[in-house]
Amino acid sequence: MPGRPYYDIVAVGDFRFPGGTSTAVAEELRAQAAAGYRTGLLQLKGPVLKYPHAIHPQIRACLEAGAADLLDPATAVAAALVVAHHPAVFTHLPRRAIRVDAETRLLIVHHPPLDGHGEANYDWAAIHRHAEAMLGGTVLWAPTGPAVRGQFAALDDAPPLFARDWHGVIEPRPWRVARKGPLESRPVIGRHSRPDALKWPDDRATALMAYPDDPIFVVRILGGGPFLRELVGSYPPNWQVWPFNAMPPERFLATVDFFVYFHHSRWVEAFGRTVIEAMASGAVAVLPRHFEALFGEGAIYAAPHEVRACVRELHADRQAFLRQGRRGAALVNRQFGPAAHVRRLRALIGRPRPTLVGAGAPRLKRRILFVTSNGVGIGHLTRMLAVARRCPKPLEPVFLTLSQAVRIVREQGFLAEYLPFHAALGCDPQQWNQSLREELKELIAFYDPPVLVFDGNVPYQGLIDALRANPDLWSVWCRRGMWQPGRGADVIARERDFDAVVEPRDLADRLDRGLTVHHRSRTRVVDPIRLLDAGDLLPPNEARAALGIDPGRRAVLLQLGAGNNYDYATLRHAAIALLRERYDADVSVAEWPIAEQPLELPEGVRAVREYPLSRYLKAFDLVISAVGYNSFHEILLAGVPAIFVP
């Protein structure tokens, strides 16, 4: 379509999922790029993930390598094919429409509509309505395997199905193991899966049939956890168990002869990615018989009580073992490899089209809503100003701050709204949070930001309620580390209401003993956030001239905070007297924009009100400073000798 960027394929989904769905998408992206297809990636916010997740590392690597472009949901694009992944992503309609004009639309069904007991996993009728409304036309559902297709065939109200199953894709080469026969004198049985009780048999007796408690076997398990001890009790002596992700699955599978996979009766395996990984490695897959429709001659099929005999027979016959391993590897290469994916794309949309980009519609302005707490200083506000200053076009920062220093934001050229904190108003905190919720809901409706960033130590309940009322709004909590040890468990639990948690690194983080240290897996740690870069600082002579400091005297700066929560007057006056009497120093005192009381200074001592003060730090020979995050890192960046006051 004229005026719209064109892509052969647009992939739509929530690509934060840590499991097989995202791995399958990454394989498709790599195969499409290698075949010359141009792919756009449209990230949606699904309802499944309940705590912060980053984009799956393999998908992020694809984006960084240029295998796909990350699309702005507000930008209209045209495509030959939309491939939407996982029904759960379409549980709710978003606040804004997806602007993709596609010729063909598929919804890949990575999760079955029913569990093994016939109970619904999701409302497929509502999801189908939402998917067609969001994607702008007819959507065909593409099961990833025959188990899912069979469930839909039995439904009276099934959505329209694509004619062929959309199998997962794997590049076999990284998984291949040069096998000359079984690894040891004893058969090595293994399995890897995420730590979920549904991925294991229903009871202990069945589990020990498939994974014998018998010293004539070695059993290796990648993906153990408390659930497994609840199932089997103490691990048998012949079991070797590692936590999920303790090692790459490629390395694990190289230590396994037989990949034995039996799961719970409630679980319906839509595809079985771990199975094709095992077969690609040359391990012999031993599976329940319901997998035969998908994997055919690539695996051995047995009931749990038949596993022991099956494994012992193949282990004793080296040639039969190798033949079966080769059958599995050949099936993977033929049916699930990148070439198979490219063949189905060519059958569906033809070869890549030569038109790369449309006429190029201008990118729409997008507003990012920054929310900052009040604080006793202006650190929260300054950190978000540092981020806002670096936002690329067409992003437009908008602020809601509880800080009385709101004028600073406006002086920096940004839109800013001010809402007084409940302590400043003398009102009930519960009523104030209700007001905050309504204010935020109105601001979100008015500015329509795709992202809200909160900087503060404690996410307010009113903020949490506003986020819950806007489930497709992406939310980020920017929080410092260095919490007091043993404190904050109730606060850190609120991270589940954010899509991402960003922690600006503290240069003293080796001494961090606070609770955030134990939540790093859910946190994106970034370099220290500072308002100015090194090149923005004035050279010493220019800074002294700007502040009116005598170039021939020692210059000292005192910045002990706003003084709103601690009275620094006694300390300040003692320091001034000592510096002037003993060292004949030219003393300056930083005056905070939100100070409730004006500074009372002796004659000849100047108040410095410039913002940002860090621009002038090189004017001083010494800084005596409170140990706030911003002050600490700005002084270190400036390279000025300092004494920090706890």
Language-model features, listed with the residues they occupy:
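Extended catalytic core of nucleotide-activated donor transferases of GT-like folds
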Residues: 10-12, 23, 27-31, 37-136, ...
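A nucleotide-sugar donor-handling region in carbohydrate enzymes
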Residues: 161-174, 479-480, 484-487, 494-564
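A charged, aromatic-enriched C-terminal amphipathic alpha-helix characteristic of glycosyltransferases
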Residues: 305, 315-354
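Conserved catalytic-core segment of nucleotide-activated headgroup transferases in glycan assembly
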Residues: 24, 125, 143-252, 387, ...
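Nucleotide-sugar-dependent
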Residues: 199, 260-276, 288-297, 625-630, ...
